[in-house]
Amino acid sequence: MNQDNEPVSLSDFKGKKVLAYFYPKAMTPGCTVQACGLRDSKAELDEKNVVVLGISIDPVKRLPKFIERDNLNFTLLSDEDHAVAEQFGVWGLKKFMGREYDGLHRISFLIDENGTIEHVFNKFKTKDHHQVVLDYLNQ
């Protein structure tokens, strides 16, 4: 479900590339930096026919707050039961500050106009994510 509690499917974007980026939690420092970088790159992404979908396990009601607070200009999706994350292989064991737990890994997928995964972005700093994506698109 998107921030307006409406269902969204990849097939809604046929003919466009989709950057499906998984992020752990709305309104946290790293996730905010990543989202704002994509927000500020929207014109360049539009030129490349790329739609951005941010996906987290946040409840739907949290997403509009993130959009409003940071003036985000793309769709956010709630995957509370992490079913989509599991399909993409980005849900699993994480280690942070000596703790181990299941969680969402920060990985992005560029999906081509036909719905096929074209590229996986899994090595980047949150502040550089947008530039890593743009560099790939411009090569």
Named regions from a protein language model:
Residues 1-139:
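Chalcogenol-based redox active-site neighborhoods
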